[in-house]
Design a protein with these regions (language model features):
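CheY-like receiver
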Residues: 123-144
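Alpha4 helix (beta4-alpha4-beta5 surface) of REC/receiver domains from two-component response regulators
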Residues: 62, 83-103
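Alpha-helical interaction/dimerization surfaces of two-component signaling modules
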Residues: 19-21, 40, 93
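C-terminal output helix
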Residues: 107-117
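Conserved acidic segment of CheY-like receiver
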Residues: 1-21, 49
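His-Asp phosphorelay/catalytic-motif detector in bacterial-type signaling
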Residues: 45-47, 72-80
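Conserved phosphotransfer microenvironments
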Residues: 47, 51-69
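Acidic, metal-coordinating helix/loop segments flanking the phosphotransfer/catalytic sites
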Residues: 32-48
């Protein structure tokens, strides 16, 4: 039974993820901060960490970087990270952090389920639900 660690300082975000990602085949564990994520990963080594970008004094990017750093020194095993982003420009930060996947809020249950399934299966998931500005601007510039 895979364990999914859900990290956010917002109870509503944790509840939404748990309701969507949880099922009889998974165990959901919740964290409210980056340091709590680090402790729980060291104790239980979840199959996936879902982390909110905006979270207390150690947000999603810092937490993801720390998880990857610890894994690179063999202090922790590698655990995939799905990062929840507040805005489209945060994709740059998610890429830089090495997150294996990300979703831009507001969360869509179907995309969240797809992302969790992909990462639990050893894959990646990059939210393509938003259109880059160059794609949006091109039809406007051509008069279309």
């Amino acid at each position: 039974v895979p364990t999914i660690l859900v990290a956010s300082d917002a109870p509503t975000v944790r509840a939404e993820i748990a309701a969507t990602a949880g099922n009889p085949e998974t165990t959901i564990v919740e964290a409210r901060s980056g340091p709590e994520v680090m402790t729980l990963v060291a104790e239980s080594m979840p199959a996936l960490v879902v982390v909110d970008m905006q979270m207390g004094n150690m947000g999603g990017m810092a937490t993801t970087l720390e998880l990857h750093l610890e894994a690179s020194y063999d202090k922790l095993g590698h655990v995939p990270v799905l990062m929840l982003l507040d805005r489209r420009p945060d994709v740059f930060l998610a890429r830089r952090s090495g997150a294996e996947g990300w979703l831009v809020k507001p969360l869509d249950p179907i995309r969240l389920r797809r992302a969790v399934t992909a990462l639990l299966g050893g894959g990646t998931y990059y939210d393509e639900s938003y259109a880059p500005l160059s794609v949006v601007a091109a039809p406007l510039a051509s008069g279309a």
